[in-house]
């Protein structure tokens, strides 16, 4: 079981509602491959009628969309499937693969698949990596408007990305 706790974080629309989420999960591992399924016992990050029901998203121009809006209801029972693997492709070089599928109950347009394909290589005590990450999430629901006063620009956080990393295990 895992619990996501966001102290003092609440929705502005319905201030009593929080983002906190409880999930139970089961996973299996075979050699270098893993599969895990997480099931939400609570509303997924607080999503329900009073917090996001009826929301239509943000258009590329920063204006509120008015069609194809979200439904209503509880998001309890949402789930996430996580498939991953690591393969040695050369001496000291590993290929990491990930595919995930988020299902959001009652709010199907928020459901998405995500993926990551990357290479890592240790250099002494540090591992360096490079990866391509992406998703098929509907951009109108995964945009944010910067907090700059008067700004109408939006950022699509559901687009293809490239990640460079450096990590050290203690």
Tell me the role of every PLM-derived stretch.
Residues 11-13, 46-74, 139-157:
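Solvent-exposed loop segments that connect transmembrane elements
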Residues 121-126, 154-170:
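Outer-membrane beta-barrel "beta-signal"
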